[in-house]
């Protein structure tokens, strides 16, 4: 099974059109999707998971928008598969050169060692790594994650590593590498196998420049 050609983002407001246009030049033949909070709740209603009821209530139980976005990306990717990218990140290469035939990929964080940068994740539907992350998040109270903001990033890294130790090994997976260069504007993300910068995360002011390569 291959990663479906679905490219999804979420934020309260729709991204500016120039940003969507930039993305679409890198995702030809892919379907671009964006969800705001109301659309996320509708998605939960239209795509229920019987074992995980009352997902809208769980969504609103988190104080931070970042954690609500985490829950949605896990849920969407578990249901449909595809690629999720944060709205403060931008592709520099054609998405197909990253996805290839992987069943799961994301980014190894250099800023928070032992965690995954969840701003860029791709996987097949019902992927076991994402399934574990979704169930773990569903069962984690808001009070716990308030005290450990990057808990889900850490747990996703653990689930990725655990996958190597289980009988049903998801061998066709990959982590890109975020570089820690003390850049005050963005963090570059590299495909270290090919020594190519594939994505930039504009973590500082969260503004995507118009003049990217």
Model-predicted segments: where are they?
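Small-residue hinge/turn detector
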Residues: 70-82
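Glycosyltransferase-associated regions of secretory-pathway enzymes
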Residues: 1-69, 85-213
């Amino acid at each position: 099974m291959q990663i479906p050609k679905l490219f999804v983002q979420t934020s309260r407001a729709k991204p500016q059109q120039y940003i969507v246009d930039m993305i679409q030049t890198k995702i030809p033949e892919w379907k671009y999707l964006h969800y705001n909070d109301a659309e996320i709740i509708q998605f939960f209603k239209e795509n229920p998971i019987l074992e995980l009821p009352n997902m809208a209530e769980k969504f609103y139980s988190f104080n931070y928008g970042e954690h609500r976005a985490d829950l949605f990306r896990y849920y969407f990717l578990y249901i449909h598969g595809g690629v999720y990218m944060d709205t403060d990140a931008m592709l520099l290469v054609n998405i197909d050169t990253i996805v290839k035939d992987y069943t799961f990929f994301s980014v190894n964080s250099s800023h928070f060692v032992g965690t995954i940068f969840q701003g860029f994740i791709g996987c097949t539907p019902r992927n076991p790594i994402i399934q574990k992350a979704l169930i773990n998040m569903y069962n984690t109270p808001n009070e716990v994650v308030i005290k450990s903001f990057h808990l889900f990033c850490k747990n996703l890294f653990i689930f990725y590593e655990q996958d190597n130790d289980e009988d049903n090994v998801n061998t066709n997976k990959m982590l890109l590498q975020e570089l820690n260069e003390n850049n005050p504007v963005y963090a570059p993300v590299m495909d270290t196998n090919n020594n190519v910068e594939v994505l930039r995360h504009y973590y500082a002011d969260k503004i995507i420049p118009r003049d990217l390569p």
